[in-house]
């Protein structure tokens, strides 16, 4: 082996698990700020659960015969104690587990929200990743259609806050367990008569989760699915009253919707109301938010019988939609970039930068990239590229005179060039910058 160092193989990220780089992070922060403001306005409280849970939580909560549990979960055995663990594929079951474990419902209903990464072993494509991010709400302890309506209206408010248009609401009712059981018998009998049309996926689901057969995207099966027995025909008085009550509230609040009798969800815990918010601008991955009522789940996971409803939305899909509709906010950059030349100026630059940060300004202090002092020209190029509103300039002359140079970087004069540098007494710098920023903001509003 030669003395020459062997070139190390360049490592890359896991397929379907994406880095969020600085140029993208601003859009994420914009969305997160907007959605958190909306959630606060409805009185929802943040809950944060672990990324890893016991596998049994999802098997019992989501359903053993669902696609998620059968094919999509990242599960492993803990080498230390042999526990079967899973990286969460969704978060409703985990939030319910936490509510039960910590006795959160002892003093009444709770409005909770979460945000974070989820994991599913899928074929990566646009809008569908192996690590993806969701924000969601869980309204625990609310039984009537008013809670269903409120969580739906929260989504509409978020679309309005983000400026998104054309996201459509689809509704359905899955009724109660005994109603679904009666429909299931009729549905299986009907589908058995059309075995020659069913694809392999439908045949696999026929006796385990026949409702999902109706959600097929296979063109050859559309007629069979369309003519299948309708669950709505099996709904009793209680289920119908709940669904009609929801519709009345939505109509009274001018929330348009379409009833989609083939709308089901890929998780077993839903009953009564289910809904999706869909768009035609993202291709096959058109669902941006989905949810419904899951009254049986809390008891199913070991708690007392408690009504509940909620939704989750895919953040990556919403960000794709913001980009598609050109609603990405501009990065405003920082307020001040401090450049300096000479040892005394460097020491003073640190002091000034911290003083400006104390007032709430965002400040970048030039630091050497190669251990050498860069020229003023080079530093000013960095200042321009940073997007800062002003450059604060410190050199030997400024230190000797007790002044600081301030150069506007965004403003232009009548000739289209940058405005000239001002020399300001060091003790007046903060006041000067704040006044200059206020004036710039007022000019921008004109």
From Swiss-Prot:
Pfam families: HGTP_anticodon (PF03129), tRNA-synt_His (PF13393). The keyword ATP-binding applies. It is found in: Cytoplasm. InterPro entries: aa-tRNA-synth_II, aa-tRNA-synth_II/BPL/LPL, Anticodon-bd, Anticodon-bd_dom_sf, His-tRNA-ligase, HisRS-like_core, HisRS/HisZ, HisRS_anticodon. Its EC number is 6.1.1.21. It is an enzyme of class 6 (ligase). It catalyses: tRNA(His) + L-histidine + ATP = L-histidyl-tRNA(His) + AMP + diphosphate + H(+). GO terms for cellular component: cytoplasm. Its main location: cytoplasm. The keyword Cytoplasm applies. GO terms for biological process: histidyl-tRNA aminoacylation. Keywords: Aminoacyl-tRNA synthetase, ATP-binding, Cytoplasm, Ligase, Nucleotide-binding, Protein biosynthesis. Gene3D superfamilies: Anticodon-binding domain, Bira Bifunctional Protein, Domain 2. One of its GO terms (molecular function) is histidine-tRNA ligase activity. It comes from the Bacteria. Belongs to the class-II aminoacyl-tRNA synthetase family. Homodimer. NCBIfam families: hisS. HAMAP family: His_tRNA_synth (MF_00127). This is Histidine--tRNA ligase.
